[in-house]
């Protein structure tokens, strides 16, 4: 039998030629982390969370905990480096089970954060 699971993270897409990772992390008062680079546009994952909660909002709050209150800084960095932000939500929903599936709708505080930071919501779900 399949198990429910979910992954959430904040994704930053950037161009390596114009992006200063050290400035980005220092501006947000986050520890600089080594990250993998792929393709022309590169990406950073922040707040990766795989600890399942039936309410996806709780998982997202863990993902965004170090970014809440820094919306203006994120927006300024977005403009400075021409960044793209995504909130990635990747749940696995189990078909034909008596257990409830994950609540996927976002609550107002998270929607407000996405709006203020011009972050796109990316929901990729798998049905098992």
Model-predicted regions and their roles:
Residues 1-126:
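Acidic (Asp/Glu-rich) sequence patches and key acidic residues
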């Amino acid at each position: 039998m399949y198990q429910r699971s979910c992954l959430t993270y904040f994704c930053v897409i950037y161009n390596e030629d114009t992006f200063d990772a050290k400035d980005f992390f220092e501006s947000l008062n986050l520890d600089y982390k080594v990250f993998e680079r792929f393709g022309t546009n590169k990406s950073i994952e922040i707040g990766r969370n795989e600890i399942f909660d039936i309410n996806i909002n709780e998982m997202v709050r863990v993902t965004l905990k170090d970014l809440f209150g820094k919306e203006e800084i994120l927006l300024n960095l977005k403009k400075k480096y021409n960044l793209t932000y995504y909130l990635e939500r990747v749940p696995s929903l189990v078909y034909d089970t008596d257990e409830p599936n994950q609540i996927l709708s976002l609550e107002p505080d998270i929607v407000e954060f996405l709006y203020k930071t011009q972050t796109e919501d990316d929901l990729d779900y798998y049905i098992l």
